[in-house]
Amino acid sequence: MTIATLAKPKKSTPLLFEGLTWREFKAVEQLLDRPGYRLSFLDGILEIRQMPGETHETVKKRLAALLELYLLMAGFDFTPTGSMTLESEGGAVKREADESYKLAPGRSRPDLAIEIVFTSGGLNKLESYKRLKI
């Protein structure tokens, strides 16, 4: 058996802009609606990141495949919701997971989110999902 290793991803530092209101964030979001960038927002801070590369996608897809196999074998009636964008004006948060899942029928939002993280810095992802009740 051969063990394959993945190349180290390029380090990408997010751009952070502080002191925005939700309304200002939504205006900036419309202006920056371009392929290749992912915007997140938490507590008045806008984070702009370049879309992840091949290594990130490989790890994401492999982890998702393992999780989906487990959910099938465990008998969950789950729905993959992909990189669904989630936001809450009241919680002052917007986040887009790498992958997400509803673990039972009839749910309005995902129960589980997958984030593949190679670098530190940026917004507190766990706090974002906590506010989104995921």
Where are these regions (language model features)?
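Gly/Pro/Ser/Thr-rich low-complexity, intrinsically disordered segments predominantly at protein N-termini
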Residues: 1-132
